[in-house]
Amino acid sequence: MKGFKSLVVMTLTLFLVFSFMGNCNSAPQRLFERRNWTPQAMLYLKGAQGRRFLSDQSRRKDLSDRPPLERRSPNSQQLTLPEAAAVLLAFLQKPQEAGDENLDQTRFLEDSLLNW
């Protein structure tokens, strides 16, 4: 009985050691190292990793190089509440009017997709 217990303990211990060794390879090794990457390697990394490969310094530089955002309209006067409501109502009524004209086209598309 004592030999059987030691055999089971030894087997479980070996199983744990081998499973731990298998998981060590999939763990991240360390943070990204700075290297002199070629432009082609940078494009590959950007495609594979997204923008994560960029260093913090280049991120800050990218943000500082950008021009300041501008308003769409040079008119800085804000709309009053009734004016904004009128613009919103006009915007919401346009798709309904256009939707009535395109109603036959959507039926045609649905029929053609069903018969496809």
Curated annotation (Swiss-Prot):
The modification Glutamine amide is found at Q49. It is found in: Secreted; Secreted, Extracellular space; Cytoplasmic vesicle, Secretory vesicle. Residues 53-73 have a biased composition (Basic and acidic residues). GO terms for molecular function: neuropeptide hormone activity; type 2 galanin receptor binding; type 3 galanin receptor binding. The keyword Signal applies. Keywords: Amidation, Cleavage on pair of basic residues, Cytoplasmic vesicle, Hormone, Secreted, Signal. Transmembrane segments: none annotated. Residues 53-80 are annotated as: Disordered. The keyword Iron does not apply. Residues 27-35, 50-116, 74-116 form a propeptide. Its main location: secreted. Residues 1-26 form the signal peptide. GO terms for biological process: long-chain fatty acid import into cell; negative regulation of appetite; negative regulation of heart rate; negative regulation of renal sodium excretion; positive regulation of gastro-intestinal system smooth muscle contraction; positive regulation of systemic arterial blood pressure; positive regulation of transcription by RNA polymerase II; regulation of sensory perception of pain. It comes from the Eukaryota. GO terms for cellular component: cytoplasm; dense core granule; extracellular space; transport vesicle. The record marks R35, N36, R52, F53, R72, S73 as: Cleavage. Belongs to the spexin family. Plays a role as a central modulator of cardiovascular and renal function and nociception. Also plays a role in energy metabolism and storage. Inhibits adrenocortical cell proliferation with minor stimulation on corticosteroid release. This is Spexin. It comes from Bos taurus (Bovine).
